[in-house]
């Protein structure tokens, strides 16, 4: 995934 809403 290129972006996640958490790290």
Curated annotation (Swiss-Prot):
Signal peptide (UniProt feature, chain positions): none
Residues modified to Pyrrolidone carboxylic acid: 1
Tissue expression: Expressed by the skin dorsal glands.
BP GO terms, sorted: defense response
GO cellular component, one term: extracellular region
Modified residues (Arginine amide): 7
Cellular compartment(s): Secreted
UniProt keyword terms in alphabetical order: Amidation, Amphibian defense peptide, Pyrrolidone carboxylic acid, Secreted
Keyword set includes Secreted: yes
Family indicated by similarity: Belongs to the frog skin active peptide (FSAP) family. Peroniin subfamily.
Protein name: Peroniin-1.5
